[in-house]
Amino acid sequence: MDADHLLGASIIRIPPHHYIHVLDQNTNIARVEIGPLTYIRQDNERVLFAPVRMMMVPPRHYCVVLNPAVRDDEGQVQFDGSGQVKLRHADLEIRLAQDPFPLYPGEEIQKDVTPLQIVYPDTALRLQALLDFEEEGGEKRVAGDEWLFEGPGTYIPRKEVTVLEVIKATVIRENQAIRLRARKEGLDRSGVQRVTGEEWQVSKVGAYLPGAHEEVVDIVSAFILTDKKALHVRAIRPFRDAGGRDRRTGEEWLVTVADREAHIPSVAEEVVGVVDVTTLNSRQYCVIMDPVGADGKPQLGQKRVVKGERSFFLMPGEHLENGIQDVYVLSEEEGLVLRAVEAFIDTQGDEAEEEERESRAKKRGVQRRPGDRWMLRGPIEYVPPATVEVLLTRTAIPLDENEGIYVRDIKTGKVRAVIGQTYMLTQDEELWEKELPANVESLLAQSRDPLADRSDRGRSFGQAERDKTRVVSYRIPHNATVQVYDYREKKARVMFGPEMVMLGPDEQFTVLSLSGDKPKRPNVIKTICLLLGPDFCTDIITIETADHARLQLQLSYNWHFDLKQPADAAQAAALFSVPDFVGDACKAIASRIRGAVASVQFDDFHKNSNRIICSAVFGFDEKLAVRSSLRFGQNGLVISSVDIQSVEPVDQRTRDALQKSVQLAIEITTNSQEAAARHEAERLEQEARGRLERQKITDQAEAEKARKELLELEAQSAAVESTGAAKAEAQSRAEAARIQGEAAVEEAKLKAEAQKIEADSELARLCKAREQELNYKKQIDHLEVEKQQKLADIESQRFKHLMDNLGTETLKEMARAGPELQVKLLQSLGLKSTLITDGSSPINLFTTANGLLGSLQGKDKDE
């Protein structure tokens, strides 16, 4: 609002160094009015803006004016005929430090007052000409030219020149260089003619300021070379290196410390890598592939052996075969199998003969042809030449008396076993792996004792990997035998334990596949050794009597092989004539038992089971007496005894009925015993409850007595209190105060005495109650102990009286009542004799027959 009011005012006061623009509305021309001035505005004039401060450019500053006014040689502003200021339209004018000046109509400030740019030492401004002009020194500049304004100095801008960038000098330190590239053809700072894109290096220590047409590509640091590091470089274009040697494109070489201590790669060199020194000690060597010859060129396809002590750098194109290798130091128990790669004369093999042929002046070598194999034995220190290839390192194999290895001659193919001596394979021998059947491998790998672990077939034993080149050995336990068959000789040999059996290259174990489990199943037991016994085997068989009673028998047989030591070859071979002697023997015995039992009744079998089974198994001799054993003539197996472990009915209904009758008898006896014990316990419990109630009544009476005494004391206290009050009322009113005080004192004493009496009575009551409660607890615990003792005595007496009252005959009748009923039921079915037993409580019939025979013999003696 103030500015608008000021512009509309007729009188405008212009301070010093201020100005305004006044527009003549008749001619439409603006002019400048400069203060200090009091300007009176005419009616046809309009002030365009309020007084504005003149432009002030301080020293070392400048500003840029757009559309500047035209001035004459004396610096005066030029006007046209109408009085308007002449302007250089679209032109610029840079004004430096001067007196304050106004902006004429049409002039604009394109760039405000700005400090002049100071160019410091080792820096420069890269300038570019926008227009053709001539500098004060007479040098002509064409639009597009670029040059440098180097410091130190202050840059005065021109309208024809623009500043592209500020360039700083690059500091070059020791062992450094800068790589430059020419952006335009011309001379560099050294005066050398450069073409566009050309690169060169400057390694002079100090600050380097690139020229206007130069650009810094990179700062290259020198590679410090030592005795342990070298530089592998490659030429990327033909040039002459620092050593004065001409290099071709693609050529590679090493720069070592012998050439220079620090190497700065030139623009024509490419660093491939840093090569470490290869150091060999006195016990190392290496084989260099494609070695560089004396002419500096790699000899492709050749090898060179270098032995320590030595340090060297691998030249470009060279590489080590298998790296740095240790020299072969062989002892007396070691050797090397060598093969010739090329034909040569071997002098290494004659070193052992030199000691015996010292008289010979000239040493003769051995001619080796490509592919020849030979063995070098220790002790020796050996470095294989380039014409020899090391195939194997042999080490002597120490063998004990019971150890051996399989050796095959690779020329003849024959395999032999070397046992009991330290042996080193020759160049024509190799270890041979003996393959065994899978079942034999598993049996040998298991750490199972054939005798102690013969029944642990379900348990898994630890298995160790077998060395197939070692001679297969097996320790035969005591009282056992093993059969080994030689397939080349077609012979078998039998060995008896304790012994160590070792297989030849063509020998194999005879594996026995025996029956096992209960009942017997074939191919359950796999074993190599055959136990000679004595031992036992158990089998379960099912038989049927003449009256069709099916029974299941579990029998155990004691067996052994009848063999006299030392045994001849025929007897030993007969042991393995029957592959499954267990299954065959069990089947034969089961067949005999079934045949014998099928012709007898169940009742007879029940009474004479042992005699029937033994006679069926062993048979009778000439005197009609049961034999003591059963012998199998094929392999000499002898069955010495038969143990009847259990006899159970096969029919489920018979088994259930028998079990039910036994359980019923047991339940009747148990229920009667439980009823008597329950009655006795209830009686004792009632007696204890009565004593407990009596004790409670006694305790209550004592408590009431104590309460009565308390009430009497309270009544006496009340009487004393009332008497004192009446006596005080009868006395004169004159002594009322004294009497009242004495009465109060007496009343307090009586109250305290009453409270004391009440507390004492309560304490006595509580003590009596606690004492009675403790006595009650003690009596309860004592009664509980007596109760348990009496219950135990009653139970023992009850059982004793029960047994005495029942009597032996009654118990027998009770025991026979159920079975006789079952027998009668079975007889009603047409069965002549039966045997009923509980499946969970089997009847042992092993001594039944002997008991019957013993009773008969006793009767005969009595008669």
From Swiss-Prot:
Segments traversing the membrane: none
Protein's cellular compartments: Cytoplasm; Nucleus
Superkingdom of this protein's organism: Eukaryota
Domain IQ, chain residue ranges per copy: 677-706
A GO biological process held by the record: eye development
InterPro entries: Band_7/SPFH_dom_sf, MVP, MVP_rep_dom, MVP_rep_sf, MVP_shoulder, Vault_2, Vault_2_sf, Vault_3
Pfam families to which the protein is assigned, alphabetical: MVP_shoulder (PF11978), Vault (PF01505), Vault_2 (PF17794), Vault_3 (PF17795), Vault_4 (PF17796)
Cellular component terms per the entry's GO annotation: cytoplasm; nucleus; ribonucleoprotein complex
Protein keywords: Cytoplasm, Nucleus, Repeat, Ribonucleoprotein
Residue span of region Disordered: 349-368
MVP repeats: 2-60, 61-115, 116-168, 169-221, 222-276, 277-327, 328-396, 397-471, 472-534
Primary site of residence: cytoplasm
Leader sequence segment: none
Function comment: Required for normal vault structure. Vaults are multi-subunit structures that may act as scaffolds for proteins involved in signal transduction. Vaults may also play a role in nucleo-cytoplasmic transport.
Assembly notes: The vault ribonucleoprotein particle is a huge (400 A x 670 A) cage structure of 12.9 MDa. It consists of a dimer of half-vaults, with each half-vault comprising 39 identical major vault protein (MVP) chains, PARP4 and one or more vault RNAs (vRNAs).
Name assigned to this protein: Major vault protein
